[in-house]
Amino acid sequence: MTKLEEHLEGIVNIFHQYSVRKGHFDTLSKGELKQLLTKELANTIKNIKDKAVIDEIFQGLDANQDEQVDFQEFISLVAIALKAAHYHTHKE
């Protein structure tokens, strides 16, 4: 497996590590998303202390408004995080 393929598989594995905890095994509840954000993107969101911001992130990702974030919706967050990481590498 190539390095990129390993990283892609890692993203899928992280999603599933949190999605299986509550409710449907292939979606993230608000609580699961919060846990994922605070543990897996801790440095990216370190300045976000307000619970309302996490709620806004959840609502923004929940495109079909079913109170769950599926993998397709989660990928939107991954894309935003990747853009931020890319931007940050050019600022250093």
From Swiss-Prot:
It is found in: Secreted; Cytoplasm; Cytoplasm, Cytoskeleton; Cell membrane. Zn(2+) binds at H16, D26, H86, H90. Keywords: Antibiotic, Antimicrobial, Calcium, Cell membrane, Copper, Cytoplasm, Cytoskeleton, Fungicide, Immunity, Inflammatory response, Innate immunity, Membrane, Metal-binding, Repeat, Secreted, Zinc. The gene is S100A12. This is Protein S100-A12. Homodimer. Homooligomer (tetramer or hexamer) in the presence of calcium, zinc and copper ions. Interacts with AGER and both calcium and zinc are essential for the interaction. Interacts with CACYBP in a calcium-dependent manner. Ca(2+) 1 binds at S19, K22, H24, T27, E32. The hinge domain contributes significantly to its chemotactic properties. SMART domains: S_100. GO terms for cellular component: cytoplasm; cytoskeleton; cytosol; extracellular region; nucleus; plasma membrane; secretory granule lumen. Cu cation binds at H16, D26, H86, H90. It is a peripheral membrane protein. One of its GO terms (molecular function) is identical protein binding. SUPFAM superfamilies: EF-hand (SSF47473). Residues 13-48, 49-84 form the EF-hand domain. GO terms for biological process: antimicrobial humoral immune response mediated by antimicrobial peptide; defense response to bacterium; defense response to fungus; endothelial cell migration; inflammatory response; innate immune response; killing of cells of another organism; mast cell activation. Residues 38-53 are annotated as: Hinge domain. S100A12 is a calcium-, zinc- and copper-binding protein which plays a prominent role in the regulation of inflammatory processes and immune response. Its pro-inflammatory activity involves recruitment of leukocytes, promotion of cytokine and chemokine production, and regulation of leukocyte adhesion and migration. Acts as an alarmin or a danger associated molecular pattern (DAMP) molecule and stimulates innate immune cells via binding to receptor for advanced glycation endproducts (AGER). PANTHER family: PROTEIN S100-A12, S100 CALCIUM-BINDING PROTEIN. Ca(2+) 2 binds at D62, N64, D66, Q68, E73. Predominantly expressed by neutrophils, monocytes and activated macrophages. Expressed by eosinophils and macrophages in asthmatic airways in regions where mast cells accumulate. Found in high concentrations in the serum of patients suffering from various inflammatory disorders, such as rheumatoid arthritis, psoriatic arthritis, Crohn's disease, ulcerative colitis, and Kawasaki disease.
